[in-house]
From Swiss-Prot:
Family membership noted in the UniProt record: Belongs to the tRNA nucleotidyltransferase/poly(A) polymerase family. Bacterial CCA-adding enzyme type 1 subfamily.
Chain sites annotated for binding Mg(2+): 21, 23
Gene from which this protein is expressed: cca
Molecular functions per Gene Ontology: ATP binding; CCA tRNA nucleotidyltransferase activity; cyclic-nucleotide phosphodiesterase activity; magnesium ion binding; phosphatase activity; tRNA binding
Domain text: Comprises two domains: an N-terminal domain containing the nucleotidyltransferase activity and a C-terminal HD domain associated with both phosphodiesterase and phosphatase activities.
Keyword Phosphoprotein: no
Protein name, entry field: Multifunctional CCA protein
């Protein structure tokens, strides 16, 4: 029995990054031998065991063969005769196909160390094409490490897309990988990589459709809608925003892809126009409710937020109510963060002032000070309660607006 650390733990150590999880491969052993040594079986599809003390995963060396479309369509073979090199050959990328022995020596039959030094993502073998999830994983690694994709690997991914492999991806796995990619330091790299190989049009056609759509150069010097959305997304990432804000950044301008050509580069009504494509995207990928709902209110209301300083007090109150800000203040503040990213995700506007965020935060705080219950209790005419509460809220908003002007 020979035991090696493999995959991401070796890769990250060589890159000088923290090692979070360690995966192990066991060469020359059998399930019975693993059980006899106290390992606990957990693998449903192939022999994986938990170490009796560390609870880390140990997998028997194996080979794989594709028998059907999709990432479930595999059969595997494991035996004491399967070599370490054969096990590494089934892995996706050269940088993930390096093994480390107990003495620290490395087995790197596919040049992973050289690709790490060069900053290149390269497939190990043509078997890469057998698992469409690998397209998403590679794009995610591009976002994490800001590595280039080897030309031959990009060509292989294009062939996979052309062969319909991307269409075999199931919604849960697509969202799982997209969510991880959104949380990387440079999430735009994931989407641009997917677009380059053609997978974005298959997985997220609503986002892909934004590329090539022009905007007014005076508002958007970057002009291209797709370029803008990528900048917004990267700004949100650089600010350390949570997943829901990053997803809202990705989806806030989907309606611009539907603007009639004769109207371009203006995008009148794109806020409402994006509701249907966003809903379809979220339905198809089974996007979590918190991400879906924040993206929706950001899409519908972001231009009103940008104009916040111009809005009448009653319009500010309507904005707060339409966003359910009085019951969900934390979500409203997240929307403001997405709107800030929208403003600064423009060429040359990366440090633009955005007082709208502080202004609306102050308006929300002032409005929340109104005791609606006390007003209702003191209102003799029950039918007048809503209007009386709104009047009180509008009054504090007006006062806050005047104080803001004075400051």
């Amino acid at each position: 029995m020979e035991i090696y650390i493999v995959g991401g733990a070796v890769r990250d150590r060589l890159l000088g990054l923290p090692v979070k999880d360690r995966d192990w491969v066991v060469v020359g052993s059998t399930p019975d031998e693993m059980l006899a040594q106290g390992y606990r079986p957990v693998g449903k599809d192939f022999p994986v065991f938990l170490h009796p003390e560390t609870q880390e995963e140990y997998a028997l060396a194996r080979t794989e063969r594709k028998i059907a479309k999709g990432y479930h369509g595999f059969t595997f073979h494991t035996s004491p005769e399967v070599t370490l090199e054969e096990d590494l050959a089934r892995r996706d990328l050269t940088i993930n196909a390096i093994a480390e022995a107990a003495d620290g020596s490395l087995t790197d039959p596919y040049g992973g160390q050289e690709d790490l030094k060069a900053g290149v993502l390269r497939h190990v073998s043509e078997a890469f094409a057998e698992d469409p999830v690998r397209i998403l994983r590679l794009a995610r690694f591009a976002a994490r490490f800001d590595f280039a994709v080897a030309p031959e690997t990009m060509a292989l991914m294009r062939r996979m897309v052309d062969d319909g492999e991307a269409d075999a991806l199931v919604a849960e796995r697509v969202w799982q990988e997209l969510a991880k990619g959104l949380m990387e330091d440079k999430p735009s790299r994931m989407f641009l990589t997917l677009r380059e190989c053609g997978a974005l049009a298959r997985i997220l056609p609503e986002v892909d459709a934004l590329f090539g759509v022009p905007q007014r150069a005076d508002h958007h010097p970057e002009i291209d809608c797709g370029d803008h959305v990528m900048r917004v997304l990267d700004y949100a990432a650089a600010a350390g925003q949570p997943l829901a804000v990053r997803f809202a950044a990705l989806g806030h301008d989907l309606g611009k892809a539907l603007t009639p050509a004769k109207v371009l580069p203006r995008h009148i009504g794109h806020e409402e126009g994006g509701i249907a494509p966003l809903a379809e995207l979220c339905r198809r990928l089974r996007v979590p409710n918190d991400c879906r709902d924040l993206a929706h209110i950001t899409m519908v209301h972001h231009t009103k937020v940008h104009r916040a300083l111009e809005l009448r007090p009653d319009t500010v109150l309507r904005l707060l109510k339409d966003c359910d800000a009085l019951r969900r203040p934390e979500r409203f503040l997240q929307m403001l963060d997405a709107c800030l990213a929208d403003t600064r995700g423009r060429l040359g506007f990366e440090r633009a002032p955005y007082p709208q965020k502080d202004y609306l935060q102050a308006q929300l705080a002032a409005t929340l000070q109104i005791d609606a219950g006390a007003i209702a209790a003191g209102c003799a005419d029950k039918a007048a309660i809503p209007a009386t509460i709104d009047a009180a809220r509008t009054a504090v908003i007006a006062k806050c607006k005047e104080e803001w002007k004075e400051d």
